Amino acid sequence: MMKGAKFSSLLVLFFIFPIAFAQLRVGFYSQSCPQAETIVRNLVRQRFGVTPTVTAALLRMHFHDCFVKGCDASLLIDSTNSEKTAGPNGSVREFDLIDRIKAQLEAACPSTVSCADIVTLATRDSVALAGGPSYSIPTGRRDGRVSNNLDVTLPGPTISVSGAVSLFTNKGMNTFDAVALLGAHTVGQGNCGLFSDRITSFQGTGRPDPSMDPALVTSLRNTCRNSATAALDQSSPLRFDNQFFKQIRKRRGVLQVDQRLASDPQTRGIVARYANNNAFFKRQFVRAMVKMGAVDVLTGRNGEIRRNCRRFN
């Protein structure tokens, strides 16, 4: 039944992204590098055992890569003006994990598995390790040959709900997808500077944001006295579940855009459905991740298969 459900979901997505899915497929490396997904999974599992926050880090990396020129690993390039140097990418980490995975794959199957697919697969595996869904995802992406920090225009935490949703709909997704992907904040961490005004002087009023639970204000103040970051899901910060949605319905959203999801007419009904049904949220999250993983991908003879994820060939 599960295999049929996965096939059905991918069939629907094929018609949504016909060009991308024409050359992406589940098991793309089954002949050329049959151990590829096992190598990725084992190294991610090792990292997760030491640093459970790897899930949040890889989700952030995958999102930031896909939403700038597509899922092409352009974020991984080291240079003085690459995407990696742009302000919004300053908090992206776990590049060293991608390097280790790439090194093992190159030893096993030289010039075969793209860095773009490594990021996609590693993110998928880290979500499952954190208690999220296990799912199949198409592979066959190729790596981009361009990485420019001027192309990075990712939104900040005060973006409106309509603005956030439009980022996803402009990429071929819908509102359910947008809210599901923002639900990845269930394992996220936020720099205290991103919400400091909400707990001190909201919009220059000298008082905290009235839409935030006062108990959360106090808790975040204490956290930010001793740490530069705070969990975006204060209930189960290392567990991939629907607690994030339950929290924002209780006025316990840490980022302003997260809290707005629970009250905006465009998204509050979806938030309620995800909060009330963890299985439904996880199914929708899988659909959204597969869609996002097909955004503006390079396939066939386009792009390249990098030998080192930090450098163009």
UniProtKB/Swiss-Prot annotation:
Instruction: Let me know which tissues express this protein, per UniProt.
Output: Mainly expressed in roots.
User: Cofactor note from UniProt?
Assistant: Binds 1 heme b (iron(II)-protoporphyrin IX) group per subunit.
* Binding-site residues, Ca(2+) 2: T186, D233, S236, D241
Enzyme class (EC, first level): oxidoreductase
Binding sites annotated in the UniProt record for heme b: H185
Q: Where is this site: Transition state stabilizer?
A: R60
Q: Cytoplasm: is it a keyword of this entry?
A: no
Task: Name which cysteines form disulfide bonds.
Answer: C33-C109, C66-C71, C115-C309, C192-C224
Q: State the SUPFAM superfamilies in the record.
A: Heme-dependent peroxidases
Q: Which Pfam families match?
A: peroxidase
Q: Which UniProt keywords apply?
A: Calcium, Disulfide bond, Heme, Hydrogen peroxide, Iron, Metal-binding, Oxidoreductase, Peroxidase, Secreted, Signal
Entry's PANTHER family? PEROXIDASE (PTHR31517:SF59), PTHR31517
**Which family does the similarity line name?**
Belongs to the peroxidase family. Classical plant (class III) peroxidase subfamily.
Protein name listed in UniProt: Peroxidase 57
Q: Tell me the organism.
A: Arabidopsis thaliana
Q: What taxonomic lineage is listed for the species of origin? A: Eukaryota, Viridiplantae, Streptophyta, Embryophyta, Tracheophyta
Originating gene = PER57
